[in-house]
């Protein structure tokens, strides 16, 4: 997937700009990007609301489809959904938490791995 992929659907919930969402059989819902939230499945349906405006349920919505990647977290790092990660400087390629909101946004965390949104 590339960030140029645009899909559309009907909002089944209120959608804030640039929030994570999921495509369902009944429309497009939104989630908080946490693993335990059943309204989102980043691995299969990673999308970000492609708008500066807030959509309300029943409105037509355009979404930007993003690629996702699962990466290993460097030992000792405390990373949560919503954080930003960058590669560690030790050359291992493992994810470390970014001191600023730069790098790749974390969609979910499972054990020693996190799923990041590719831009």
Swiss-Prot record:
It comes from the Archaea. This is Uncharacterized protein MJ0336.
């Amino acid at each position: 997937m590339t960030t140029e992929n645009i899909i559309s659907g009907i909002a089944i919930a209120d959608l804030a700009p640039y929030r994570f969402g999921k495509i369902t059989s009944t429309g497009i819902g939104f989630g908080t990007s946490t693993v335990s939230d059943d309204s989102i499945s980043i691995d299969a349906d990673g999308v970000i609301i492609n708008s500066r405006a807030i959509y309300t349920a029943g409105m037509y919505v355009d979404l930007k489809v993003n690629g996702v990647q699962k990466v290993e977290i460097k030992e000792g790092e405390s990373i949560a959904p919503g954080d930003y990660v960058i590669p560690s400087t030790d050359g291992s390629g493992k994810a470390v938490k970014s001191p600023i909101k730069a790098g790749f946004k974390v969609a979910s965390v499972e054990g020693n791995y996190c799923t990041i949104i590719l831009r």
